[in-house]
């Protein structure tokens, strides 16, 4: 079986004396929806950074869609992420001098593969549809600096989903959303994954969301992975 994500003998440390992650094996099948949890400082965001190619493992293999990211240069990892990964950052990473629709369209405009996956639908039209689904459709010409935190988070969500990436990585994506908007987001996220067959890696402290996922991955205080059975 070819896994969407496969890690083996992975170790990572920001400084040599302080190991952050030690992962002997982690395999995630195409289309899996994996819920990642663990105490603060256990390495959840670091794990996402390795899977997205933002960080490079010190040892071992990090294979995403058959590509070992540890063998790629920084520029090549950036290109791979742009083509295949939709990342909802915990800090949003919006471009402050762009408005809402421009932020949503940004990665799709600079990445040919994402545009191709939209087919005949224009990028702006697809971006507007996502904004409408997330309740920010009337804010598309507004500067992101004028948005509430919850609205900024929904812009980040729309940007990550545009272009139907094969891998969706979400770092605390519901943390700034109220109950209604959280439900809207989760519905859209799971519908998008089902429609495209995307693999979802979702980090959250809210374990009440865990039953929605078919995989759960616990990061322990020892910075290692503990896997629950596949549902």
Place the predicted regions along the sequence by residue:
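Conserved ABC ATPase signature
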Residues: 143-147, 151
